[in-house]
């Protein structure tokens, strides 16, 4: 499948093709996110807390 975009990747593992945690707050988690958490910022936003493959540094449109 296609990798989701992520403006700001947080922790990544050290593998050759790293899996990362994306720090972005999004209206809904991407398909395939293993651990989606709701973050209360006044409006319901979500953050994917599992290690996933992302295109890091790619703005999500």
UniProtKB/Swiss-Prot annotation:
One of its GO terms (cellular component) is extracellular region. InterPro entries: Bowman-Birk_prot_inh (IPR035995), Prot_inh_BBI (IPR000877). The record marks 14-15 as: Reactive bond for trypsin. Expressed in bulb (at protein level). It holds the Pfam family Bowman-Birk_leg. GO terms for molecular function: serine-type endopeptidase inhibitor activity. Disulfide bonds join 5-60, 6-22, 9-56, 12-20, 29-36, 33-48. Belongs to the Bowman-Birk serine protease inhibitor family. This is Bowman-Birk type proteinase inhibitor B5.
């Amino acid at each position: 499948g296609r990798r989701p975009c992520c403006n700001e990747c947080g922790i990544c593992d050290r593998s050759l093709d790293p899996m990362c945690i994306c720090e972005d707050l999004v209206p809904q988690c991407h398909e395939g996110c293993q651990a989606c958490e709701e973050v209360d910022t006044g409006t319901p936003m979500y953050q994917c807390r599992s290690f996933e493959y992302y295109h890091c540094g790619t703005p999500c449109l």
